[in-house]
Amino acid sequence: MTSPVDASSSKEKLTLAEKVWRDHVVSKGENGEPDLLYIDLQLLHEVTSPQAFDGLRMAGRKLRRPDLHLATEDHNVPTEGIKTGSLLEINDQISRLQVSTLRDNCKEFGVRLHPMGDVRQGIVHTVGPQLGATQPGMTIVCGDSHTSTHGAFGAMAFGIGTSEVEHVMATQTLPLKPFKTMAIEVTGELQPGVSSKDLILAIIAKIGTGGGQGYVLEYRGEAIRKLSMDARMTICNMSIEAGARAGMIAPDETTFEYVKGREMAPTGADWDEAVAYWKTLPTDEGAEFDKVVEIDGSSLTPFVTWGTNPGQGLPLSESVPDPEDFTNDNDKAAAEKALQYMDLTPGTPLREIKIDTVFLGSCTNARIEDLEIAAEILKGRKIADDIRMMVVPSSTWVKQEAEKLGLDKIFIEAGAEWRTAGCSMCLGMNPDQLKPGERSASTSNRNFEGRQGPGGRTHLVSPAVAAATAVRGKLSSPADL
């Protein structure tokens, strides 16, 4: 954690993002040049790190701060047949090479790694928080788009490219220009049966997939304050789907309670000092954002996507839209293209869309709370005969906690597959893929063409909608059961 700047000496009103930025500036850029920002934590995985390590090696450089790097194996790992974590359990040669290379690099450069078979292994954006490595007020980067997940703790977290990964390895800094700030004010309270996934899908549908471009989004309001940390991570995770650089939620007692006692969290007097600093981070009253967007949380209902980007979504109670109803020519063309790929007819009730595969997994929605929500709906029920349901915990720790609660038995008895931890069907980079033409209801974060496998069609949903859909065989909410 970077030592805080004494804000009491300044009357300037700052947002959460501006405070974290201020406390990490090593040198201020002049004449339009970027600031040099200190990075508190870099997360690594097997896909975007090899070239960065090679860059260090070719330049004869050391890894400046191995202690501020944390690695895990997640993107390419299989989610079945894993017993020991041996490389021989990975059948795909390219995936095996990437995992092997990560292990070799971490050993050579002294980076802490949690490999397959380790109880602390899992998707990188679950591993950081569960270890207590993710803390309020930090700057966190990773060669992965959904690094914004960690913003749920009041950290400024964002994805970077491989050349930037190497830069952080070599210097523990990044040259960056300050981001703009946007407040997402969620008024009212979420109704029973409405989740943080429904909320973030509704936000993206409102502002668009480019609406947050260049901004850090700060999610605010009583509805946000009442969310658990698992739910907050879901919201911040998908900030990138609105085009934002990062998403943040101010730390509070819910945050502190989550972090306290975890392996890498401060202890004793250091904990007290850290909490005192964290309490200074929330946006000052009277601070100005570059943009403010309001959304009525009390009016939301279960939300799903119908198209091929996360902004193409509607309440589950509605029907597939008609491209002719779009007033913007670009939106109209995008809708026409999406409906052709998704093989959907305008006017079809969303609840009548038949599903082949239900995927409960990813860094968006596969933490313990997500699994509990789905298991409660599936308890005593069976999934539809022609449905395949895959349940993939986001970490080995989450898997073990779920098994202690008996959730695995509920899923298996319902007819679902209970897998080991990994990114799995979120992306077509491992054995878990849709076949061409197959349609999924997925708790992941992206519904792009081919994202879950060539020709696969993806509808983004919440864990509750995923579970209800598995039972009914069509897009459904628990109220439909």
Swiss-Prot record:
Cite the binding residues for [4Fe-4S] cluster.
C363, C423, C426
Q: List the disulfide bonds.
A: none
Cofactor dependence: [4Fe-4S] cluster
Q: Could you tell me what the cofactor note in this record states?
A: Binds 1 [4Fe-4S] cluster per subunit.
EC supergroup of this enzyme = lyase
Summarize the subunit comment: Heterodimer of LeuC and LeuD.
Instruction: Provide the family line.
Output: Belongs to the aconitase/IPM isomerase family. LeuC type 1 subfamily.
**What protein am I looking at?**
3-isopropylmalate dehydratase large subunit
Species source reads: Corynebacterium efficiens (strain DSM 44549 / YS-314 / AJ 12310 / JCM 11189 / NBRC 100395)
